[in-house]
């Protein structure tokens, strides 16, 4: 019997602790009519039945409001409704266009793009699948040519046509069927999914009925209304709530652990006047993307291109400098300038302790490195100079032999590490600088292992067993590296992950897991090579790095192991190297 006693209604919460178990928070976009923001109850009731906590989002096209809303969401549902104004797609209106809803359009396109930036799981329903397409670069047909009735007169709970599903899809995994029966209430449909989505289901008249992410993200759009299809429809909501739960777990994990990328080349774009405090489309690493991807720290290197015989160094760089050392100094000056402009949010870290301090204080960290010992200009005193600038490693060479060692893409000038290179390694040991053999030739690698008194590292190197290119490490190299306590970090340069086809996040995971199989969990990590041609589908920039964590969680890696992969192993070696300083 209904009671009007408030205390009795609260008793369930008050009689336990915590008052409620965690449920992922699912935002649902509201419709708008007249002066009312509304939502049909079937949407939020299905969310509750699936184990989520629904929150209705009013149509407010204010980025500040939307961003603050998204901070509290674990998943997002883009609900059904009227037509989109075709001007959002650069099109003139068709005579068959129905009612548009200007209050919703901008607000929902903005929230979709901002949620996409943050990797928030999304489900688009009817108009919502069209929202996904428009926001992510696709197209919507203003009025479909119908061979099948797509706007039924039957009750909303009654399925009226068949949808054919691709087997390699999220939808097939949900239903384990190639055909399902759905309801239908639309005259528009996605005509082109765009680069970020792919078609996974069609009706018999070839209308796109469902799309999903083409980048292994948790995004699904359906043209029908599963909220009305009871148990059959509930399965889609359960999928979203499950993905939202996983996303929540990954976010919580990132709050507890330190995440460090050991190699990026963002300074290569400094001549273009990039803005690190903007979401800058020219670069893959900036404050916005690091925040969206829950990334704590990156290692920015001064990359020095290796001149060919007869070339001058100054002809290969954009800045007017006297030589490699001055160029590296200029890069570090510019990084320091970026940090000084963003001190509330950004810091230069020189030690593991600095990284942890920055995380506690809510700042992102940049560590400094040199990619190509050419920066030393054959002057051993420059090792000390750059140590004083705060670098944590030097990659001994790049693509081409230098005066330190032979490159993986060199011509065996020294048969490994040169006599000068041996002195450089010894001085790096003395000054607490990590010796990085990414790009090094195989003989150089083994020479450095023998010479160095501290473990060496490979900041961005993948597996030759999976992608047979000289730049990658053989299994024997990996075993030798691990035996000396070193680490090798899988890189996201597509040509080092696969020789044919397009590399993606699954290739990166395969290389990581091969390295774990060969070396053990204590010797692996991630060095993206972002802005140095690194970046693949699913891990295209810093905003997508939480997807790496999601893949590790799906594979049941423990928190302890994820800590190691996300930089713990690297920082163990850094501590050992810096403690050896004398």
PLM features: what roles do these ranges have?
Residues 249-413, 468-489, 493-526, 530-582:
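N-terminal hydrophobic targeting/anchoring segments and the immediately downstream early-domain regions
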Residues 51, 119-120, 137, 294, ...:
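Glycine-centered short loops/turns at secondary-structure junctions
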Residues 24-25, 53, 121, 139, ...:
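Proline-centered loop/turn at the N-terminus of a beta-strand
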Residues 216, 294-295, 391-393, 431-433, ...:
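Glycine-enriched alpha-helix->loop->beta-strand junction motifs that scaffold or abut catalytic
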Residues 138, 353-355, 379-383, 406, ...:
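Distinct, well-ordered alpha-helical segments
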Residues 1-125, 134, 141, 145-174, ...:
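N-terminal beta1-alpha1 cap of cysteine-dependent amidohydrolase-like domains
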Residues 414-431, 448-458:
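Alpha-helix-loop-beta-strand connector modules within alpha/beta enzyme cores
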Residues 184-188, 221-226, 259-266, 440, ...:
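Histidine-centered catalytic micro-motifs
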